[in-house]
Amino acid sequence: MSYSDVSPAEVKQRLRQEALSRRADLSHVFRIEASLSLADHVDQLRLADGCIVAGFWPIRDEIDPRPLLDALRKKGHRLCLPVVAEPHLIFRELTRETEFVSAGFGTQAPSPDAAELRPDVLLMPLAAFDCSGNRIGYGKGHYDMAISALEQSGPLDCVGLAYCVQEMSDVPAEPHDKPMDGILTEMGFRRF
């Protein structure tokens, strides 16, 4: 069966499963080394001085952005993490003093006491991506809705974080899908 015989949602689900399977097959040691290497590429991001960067708390076998976030903090950027809220994600400040609460899915989020921030740069987890900047998330639409809301109040740089093995030759884009501005993998940063 060709992809032209199925809906974009079905294609995305197949690609999501394939990419997540590839990611799950990576060794534990490789995942650690790849996550650490993100910080080695921090200067390739070329972020404006003092911008606010939203990261994420990794779940399952996602690439771990915490070494990168620490490198960004050392460069003077304010950090925040997403919190699932209605009608879309909000972002709370992340500092060394931040208290965390369980946020479901095995992840942590800053407590409600943390200041809510509007990020300039959104570092996003993903299941799969292609060379045009299209991404497949986990199917809940949290980031799509957050991006749409954040773009109402100004520019937003959307950067995916992933392992190279999550790249696919072609990811279908639907009208609600916003392409990423760049991708950072263990091999470095690519701007789309």
Regions found by a protein language model. Name each.
Residues 64, 87, 142-143, 167:
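Short phosphate-engaging motifs
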Residues 139:
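Short polar/charged helix/loop
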Residues 58-61, 127-131:
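Short glycine-rich anion-binding loops that position phosphate/pyrophosphate groups of nucleotides
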Residues 1-10, 14, 21-24, 113, ...:
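Surface-exposed, charge/polar-rich loops and edge strands
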